[in-house]
UniProtKB/Swiss-Prot annotation:
Gene3D superfamilies: Pseudouridine synthase I, catalytic domain, C-terminal subdomain, Pseudouridine synthase I, catalytic domain, N-terminal subdomain. The keyword Isomerase applies. Disulfide bonds: none annotated. The active site is at 52 (nucleophile). It comes from Rickettsia felis (strain ATCC VR-1525 / URRWXCal2). The lineage of its organism: Bacteria, Pseudomonadati, Pseudomonadota, Alphaproteobacteria, Rickettsiales. It is an enzyme of class 5 (isomerase). This is tRNA pseudouridine synthase A. SUPFAM superfamilies: Pseudouridine synthase (SSF55120). The keyword rRNA-binding does not apply. Its EC number is 5.4.99.12. Formation of pseudouridine at positions 38, 39 and 40 in the anticodon stem and loop of transfer RNAs.
Length: 245
């Protein structure tokens, strides 16, 4: 068997997320069907992260096995031919060791969350960012973010449906940068809980609006209670940008 590692980008707006589900269109389904159409082989695609409906990706990584050797550039061309109508594309493909696993071999995952912060919405960024009309205090948001860096129990920021065995995660990066009318939050960790990024963003926005003081983020973290945190930020602003191995 030959194992192939692919890097994928997609607009998640009209998709049900990464994972194959009955009755809806998912990224996994689109790619598995595309691979079958050119290879004639039924494959199971393993992704480095399971993005939710509406979440986008720039650097999602996945792997699959084929019984025959194919040139990587031909795989890219073939997958993109069948997947492009769904705003899903592959931009890299390479042979990988049979010991490689897109999910379990990963050492770090990186996300960006985009906020358009101006009085009027952006037509160009419709469904590609969270529009917030009231001014956000980025400096105070960054101060609050510092409380979340490092290894913590992130129960307050996990979805009630989260299936992770442990709420303990290590946040290695949480930077907030304002560029003109756009605010970008950069988050990195070896792995994340379900909705963890979006719940952190929703809470930091309350700080940015001066609804909360920066220090309240520490209290939320220590509460270990989802009800203590802010709302879940919209999926449209979230981008899965990179996986490291």
């Amino acid at each position: 068997m030959y194992r192939y590692k692919i890097t994928i980008e997609y607009l998640g707006t009209n998709l049900a997320g990464w994972q194959r589900q009955a009755g809806v269109i998912s990224v996994q389904q689109i790619l598995e069907e595309a691979i079958y159409k050119f290879s004639g082989e039924q494959v199971i695609l393993f992704g480095s992260g399971r993005t939710d409906a509406g979440v986008h990706a720039i650097g999602q990584v996945a792997h699959f096995d084929l019984s025959k050797h194919l040139e990587p550039h031909k795989i890219i061309t073939a997958i993109n031919y069948f997947a492009r109508p769904y705003a899903v594309g592959v931009w890299n493909c390479e042979l990988a060791s049979n010991n490689f696993h897109a999910r379990f071999s990963a050492t770090s995952r990186h996300y960006i969350y985009r906020i358009i912060n101006r009085p009027y919405p952006s037509v160009i960024d419709l469904n590609r960012a969270w529009w917030i009309s009231s001014p956000l205090d980025v400096l105070t948001m960054q101060k609050a973010a510092a409380y979340l860096l490092g290894k913590h129990d992130f129960t307050s920021f996990r979805a009630s449906s989260c299936q992770s065995k442990s709420p303990i995660k290590t946040l290695t990066e949480l930077n907030i940068i304002k560029e003109d009318e756009e605010i970008k939050l950069y988050l990195s960790a070896p792995s994340f809980l379900h909705h963890m990024v979006r719940n952190i963003v929703g809470s930091l926005v309350l700080v940015g609006k001066n609804v909360w003081q920066a220090e309240q983020i520490k209290d939320v973290l220590e509460a270990k209670d989802r009800k203590a945190a802010g709302p879940t930020a919209p999926a449209s602003g979230l981008y899965f940008v990179k996986t490291e191995y």
